[in-house]
């Protein structure tokens, strides 16, 4: 059975299959669940989601998990997190083309994952 993430959406409950999730990103008190079609906010911690969803996702930063299958490439980028003048590693998520910051500590693991695809 594929794990699901249960989200509240305008008064209804939606079950999002983990296989449709491109990334999970923690922002303040919520986690953004991003699919190719849309985004939702959930009130579950990133650590809880990481434990529940298993190896399908890789932690790229303290605030983000990316689906291994959604990682297109890793490169040095100016301002991946919007901090003026800083350069850092970032991973491009397919099919949306969005870039997410990758911590220095996680860059090698992300590089290996992309190379193994």
Give the positions of each predicted feature:
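C-terminal output/interaction extensions
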Residues: 104-117
């Amino acid at each position: 059975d594929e794990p699901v993430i249960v989200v509240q959406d305008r008064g209804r409950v939606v079950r999002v299959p983990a296989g449709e999730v491109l990334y999970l990103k923690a922002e303040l008190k919520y986690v953004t669940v991003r699919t190719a079609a849309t985004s939702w906010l959930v009130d579950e911690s990133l650590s809880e989601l990481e434990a529940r969803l298993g190896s399908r996702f890789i932690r790229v930063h303290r605030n983000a998990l990316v689906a291994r299958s959604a990682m297109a490439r890793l490169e040095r980028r100016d301002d991946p997190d919007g901090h003026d003048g800083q350069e850092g590693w970032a991973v491009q998520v397919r099919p949306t083309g969005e870039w997410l910051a990758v911590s220095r500590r996680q860059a090698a693991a992300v590089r290996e994952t992309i190379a193994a695809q």
